[in-house]
Curated annotation (Swiss-Prot):
This is Probable cell division protein kinase ECU11_1290. GO terms for cellular component: cyclin-dependent protein kinase holoenzyme complex; nucleus. Residues 4-288 form the Protein kinase domain. ATP binds at V10, G11, E12, G13, A14, F15, G16, Q17, V18, K33. Keywords: ATP-binding, Cell cycle, Cell division, Kinase, Mitosis, Nucleotide-binding, Nucleus, Serine/threonine-protein kinase, Transferase. GO terms for biological process: cell division; positive regulation of transcription elongation by RNA polymerase II. Its main location: nucleus. SUPFAM superfamilies: Protein kinase-like (PK-like). It catalyses: L-seryl-[protein] + ATP = O-phospho-L-seryl-[protein] + ADP + H(+); L-threonyl-[protein] + ATP = O-phospho-L-threonyl-[protein] + ADP + H(+). It is found in: Nucleus. The active site is at D124 (proton acceptor). May play a role in the control of the eukaryotic cell cycle.
Amino acid sequence: MEKYENIKQVGEGAFGQVYKSRRTSDGAVFAIKKMPVDRETGFPFTAIREIKLCKSVINKHIIGLDEIVFEEGFIFVVLEYMPYDLTGLLASGAKLSTDQIRSITSQLIEAVSSMHGMGLVHRDIKPSNILLDCHGMLKLTDFGLTREISGMMTNRVCTLWYRAPELLLGETSYSLKVDAWSVGCIMLEMRLGRPPYRGSDEVSQIKLIFEELGIPQDKYKWSDLLDVDIYSKSRSTEEIIAERYGHLFDEEELKVLSGFLCLTSRKRLSVANSRYFTVISSHKNTYIPLSFEEAHELYTKERKETKKP
């Protein structure tokens, strides 16, 4: 990778590291994802999925792939560089305006809809995978868990705080609507300034959701293990959300939010259909500049570590 020089590390995960890097020939800046190639298993399957998705989905809100380089036991995936991810932005204390939040929501819905239109489910939509540039343009990234919808799939997907109830309850035959739940959680997080449901494991996560919203109308694989009936509510999800969050959203936004956070997956609002709400469609091509310092999840974590006594 002699033609690039690393500026700083901006991300890390089970896959490897992400660096902000400069191409020496022209000074262009990229994000380079560095992943080890296992001698026995070979090319990482998550990398195959990500590369395939970036090449197949042509949408301005999907991160762009520039090139792929193999070198010294590693694969380097060269992507567009974005100065913000939503986790870092929110954790940095940046105050997003109502219009900025609506713009981000609308763009995220467009990105996810483009995937769903091809029968692809992301399965790991979370703030750190939502990237933004200084103009307010959003790009969705990290497609290592993305796949085509089929009959039986693993339920061990999606970061815990953004995982749909049916996945937490053991469902293996699920739909694109698992992504809709994640989008709803992010809508709420941008207004609250924190993730709405922060469990420490699958059981505590589903209990937090049930305690606030009630229970699904359908039974899933593990429903009986949790005695879910004790969490039954007399009011609908729409009524509960309107009462709890009516001060944060207007009436139409509340309909979208309660649609995404519907516990019964077959009745949940699809991401594609949410585009027909005026509050979403009216912000479709609206980009509001961000004037904050660069902020990524890794930088935010490091700052928290340095503040510890």
